[in-house]
């Protein structure tokens, strides 16, 4: 019988996601034209569906929008080739890329002519695709990938690394350690690229492990940071699980695994309305379960301001 639900804090929307959503809303509010968004604005189906209801059209490729259309790039960023293609077609361009992802792009442009670059990230992820479009890079996802680069890296040319902003802090440390062992001459950046929100949400989950039986992560299946939260929780609490919506909740799973104290967190692209719906359903299953903010939690205080000019 579930007795208590501890809420992790921070959880849910990060500053970059809020920035991207606000960006689209502001462009739409100031335009009478059809607004197109390339790819999912953030990796959450509920957010995308709500925008569709408000008239936003989502496309996977620029070819799906007419010449001269207003197109906004998602929070994950795009490669320079995509930007150039939009310009060639006379499109009005809005860039809702998270400022922390933009920072990684700037770093890539700065060093692309002087350094060999290893990119720590997930193949096929929208953010990785966009960043790797800035320069020639070697993608690594595992320790084995690093070993395979031995014959590809020139020891006589400077080497450094960049990383996807939504990675597991612990796993990335292991990869960086292996890079250092394999390539002792590597230049370490003064600061890693994992964003504050990813780090803080993982730290919040780690703090709860000794006080819970399992962690419930709310997030989309294609949300990298949500999957990292689940992996982190399962290392200590194997019965931890993830749902995308309240419909995914299973009372039987909680009962069968004898979960009495449940931690709850949400990925950085998960809206609060989903969190509220899932808590409500848990309370229907277990009316006597107490819902509490986990002691020692802290708020997410970062905020990004929208630029004065939204379209170029």
Swiss-Prot record:
Binding site for isopentenyl diphosphate: 43, 76, 125, 223-225, 269
Keyword Iron: yes
E.C. no: 1.17.7.4
Reactions accelerated catalytically: isopentenyl diphosphate + 2 oxidized [2Fe-2S]-[ferredoxin] + H2O = (2E)-4-hydroxy-3-methylbut-2-enyl diphosphate + 2 reduced [2Fe-2S]-[ferredoxin] + 2 H(+); dimethylallyl diphosphate + 2 oxidized [2Fe-2S]-[ferredoxin] + H2O = (2E)-4-hydroxy-3-methylbut-2-enyl diphosphate + 2 reduced [2Fe-2S]-[ferredoxin] + 2 H(+)
Essential cofactor(s): [4Fe-4S] cluster
Catalytic residues (UniProt): 127
Protein keywords: 4Fe-4S, Iron, Iron-sulfur, Isoprene biosynthesis, Metal-binding, Oxidoreductase
Pfam families from the UniProt entry: LYTB (PF02401)
Annotated positions binding (2E)-4-hydroxy-3-methylbut-2-enyl diphosphate: 43, 76, 125, 165, 223-225, 269
Residue positions binding [4Fe-4S] cluster: 14, 98, 195
Disulfide feature: none
MF terms in GO: 4 iron, 4 sulfur cluster binding; 4-hydroxy-3-methylbut-2-enyl diphosphate reductase activity; metal ion binding
Pathway the protein takes part in: Isoprenoid biosynthesis; dimethylallyl diphosphate biosynthesis; dimethylallyl diphosphate from (2E)-4-hydroxy-3-methylbutenyl diphosphate: step 1/1; Isoprenoid biosynthesis; isopentenyl diphosphate biosynthesis via DXP pathway; isopentenyl diphosphate from 1-deoxy-D-xylulose 5-phosphate: step 6/6
GO biological process: dimethylallyl diphosphate biosynthetic process; isopentenyl diphosphate biosynthetic process, methylerythritol 4-phosphate pathway; terpenoid biosynthetic process
Class of this enzyme: oxidoreductase
GO cellular-component term (any): cytosol
Cofactor note: Binds 1 [4Fe-4S] cluster per subunit.
Alphabetical list of InterPro entries matching this protein: LytB/IspH
Residue sites binding dimethylallyl diphosphate per the record: 43, 76, 125, 223-225, 269
Summary of the function given for this chain in its UniProt record: Catalyzes the conversion of 1-hydroxy-2-methyl-2-(E)-butenyl 4-diphosphate (HMBPP) into a mixture of isopentenyl diphosphate (IPP) and dimethylallyl diphosphate (DMAPP). Acts in the terminal step of the DOXP/MEP pathway for isoprenoid precursor biosynthesis.
HAMAP family referenced in this protein's UniProt entry, alphabetically: IspH
Family: Belongs to the IspH family.
Database matches in PANTHER family: 4-HYDROXY-3-METHYLBUT-2-ENYL DIPHOSPHATE REDUCTASE
Record-given protein name: 4-hydroxy-3-methylbut-2-enyl diphosphate reductase
Organism from which the protein derives: Leptospira interrogans serogroup Icterohaemorrhagiae serovar Lai (strain 56601)
Name of the coding gene: ispH
């Amino acid at each position: 019988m579930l007795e208590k639900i501890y809420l992790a804090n921070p959880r849910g929307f990060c500053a970059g996601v809020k920035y991207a959503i606000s960006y689209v809303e502001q462009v739409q509010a100031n335009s009478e034209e059809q607004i197109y968004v390339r790819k999912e604005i953030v990796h959450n189906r509920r957010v995308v569906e709500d925008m569709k209801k408000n008239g936003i059209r989502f496309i996977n490729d620029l070819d799906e929008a007419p010449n001269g259309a207003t197109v906004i790039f998602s929070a994950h960023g795009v490669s320079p080739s995509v930007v150039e293609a939009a310009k060639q077609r006379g499109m009005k361009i809005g860039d809702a890329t998270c400022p922390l992802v933009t920072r990684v792009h700037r770093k890539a442009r700065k060093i692309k002519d002087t350094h060999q670059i290893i990119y720590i990230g997930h193949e096929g992820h929208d953010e990785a695709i966009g960043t790797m479009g800035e320069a020639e890079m070697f993608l690594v996802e595992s320790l084995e990938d690093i070993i395979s680069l031995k014959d590809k890296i020139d020891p006589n040319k400077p080497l450094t690394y960049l990383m996807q902003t939504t990675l597991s802090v612990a796993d990335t440390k292991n990869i960086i350690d292996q890079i250092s062992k394999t390539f002792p001459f590597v230049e370490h950046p003064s600061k890693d690229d994992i964003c504050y929100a990813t780090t803080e949400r993982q730290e919040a989950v780690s703090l709860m492990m000794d006080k819970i039986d399992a962690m419930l992560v709310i997030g989309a299946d294609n949300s990298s940071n949500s999957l990292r939260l689940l992996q982190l929780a399962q290392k200590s609490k194997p019965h931890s699980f993830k749902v995308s919506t309240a419909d995914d909740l299973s009372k039987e799973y909680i009962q069968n695994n004898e979960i009495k104290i449940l931690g709850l967190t949400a990925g950085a692209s998960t809206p609060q309305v989903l969190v509220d719906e899932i808590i409500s359903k848990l309370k229907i299953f277990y009316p006597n379960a107490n819902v509490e903010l986990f002691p020692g939690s802290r708020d997410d205080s970062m905020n990004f301001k929208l630029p004065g000019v939204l379209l170029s």
